[in-house]
Amino acid sequence: MAEGKLRALDLTKLSPSQKSRYYETFAQTAENRKDVIEAVKARIKMDENLTDMQRRKDNVDKTWSLLRSANTAVINNASDEGSVALGGWLTLIKAYNDNIRQPVQLSQALQSWKSAYPNHVAATFFPKELESLLNFQQTNLAQIGLVLPLSGDGQILGTTIQSGFNDAKGDSTIPVQVFDSSTTPINDIIAQAKASGIKALVGPLLKQNVDAIIANPSAVQGMDVLTLNATANTQAINQVCYYGLSPEDEAESAANKMWKDGIRNPIVAMPQNDLGQRVGNAFNVRWQRLAGTDANIRYYNLPADITYFFQGTPQDTAGLYVVSSPDELAEIKGYLDTSNPNVRIYASSRSNAASNTPEYYAKMNGVQFSDIPFFKQSDSSQYQKVAGSTGGEFQLMRLYAMGSDAWLLINHFNELRQVPGYTLSGLTGQLSADSNCDVDRDMTWYQVQDGNVVAVAN
């Protein structure tokens, strides 16, 4: 209806300013019905009626965002309809899509595009997201500093991560200098690394040491830093990325999974503690983006509390996301089998333990949980080796996988930081980075089916 009223307007009676607003409304209407190409065409018309430089630049960024969100088949099947402006946009997004896995070629393709379309609005106001790619330099490491707790209370954590890092390094000739953060203060380690000419640092792992870097970013100026943890104080710092096995990542993955599974009114049951608050908040932030509303976050002290969360809830409350131990999850499943048998249960990796028995899984039919994709590879020689060296302890195996992925990430540091949408397939998940260079992990989902754990589609 709104579009019909727009089309009925006599554009000859509108000023350029009014026309720009007209086409912006038209673009938003097309975007709402998921018609990306029509939205882009409307924004091209909008640009023709804009004089303010900032509004033109914002419009370019919005147009680029639309194209980036589009299915590649839609882009590839679109016609420029004889429009140089539309043709330029389509050529630009195709150059991006075709070269996303080869950032050096992508940089060259963008330069070529600017030469081919010198008068295009996107050449004048190059999309902000692509600016850093014009002068992209592939990651090229001379040596690496690895910062881990290798003695004291954190020794088992540090040595397990180091084992994964070293195995991923394999025969690489890049020298690695190891620093023990249990015996040397982080600021001294950074000074020693700089004195040794180290330009890339993996670590630290402990949160207080990550906070020390955040509090004094000038100390690591000129270095690429991949921390192995994130904290509440995490902020965007040039050449610093944050990576870790955060339960918040799992919560975001759960929100995505439940939304894709058609669940629209989930109950999110979190333990009544700091972990529960952080994870519940992470789920809610992602749910707001997906659904436009807050998720129903509830906090429990005892597993039995969860049955009360379903009293008076909408009939379509078909899903529960819960962070719990294996024993707590078994209790929750038992209660819901009696009171709400149709509720689909989604859980975090906290419930997935090596100590879970066949008898345990026999009671957990239908439960889905997120964990690292490495656990899909149980028949591989690498998995068998790691299971042997860690005693099959899942938490240590996750840390090993994290160490392996730390090697992968530091060797693709520039790509991760500078290439929008760049992803890496790691042992801990599909890895990508947001605008703050927080490394996101898209988890693998598993389901208990007839007593067996099988990987399912995300």
Where is each model-derived feature located?
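Periplasmic-binding protein-like
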Residues: 194-207, 225-228, 265-270, 316-329, ...
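Extracellular/periplasmic periplasmic-binding protein-like sensory domains
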Residues: 333-404, 414
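An alpha-beta-alpha
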Residues: 165, 243-298
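Segments of small-molecule ligand-sensing domains
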Residues: 391-457
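Short beta-strand segments enriched in small/hydrophobic residues
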Residues: 138-157, 267-268
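Alpha-helical protein-protein interaction scaffolds
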Residues: 1-129
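Beta-alpha junction/loop-to-helix N-cap segments that form part of ligand/metal-binding clefts
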Residues: 156-161, 174-233
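Short beta-strand elements at the ligand-binding edges of bilobed clamshell
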Residues: 233-257, 361-373
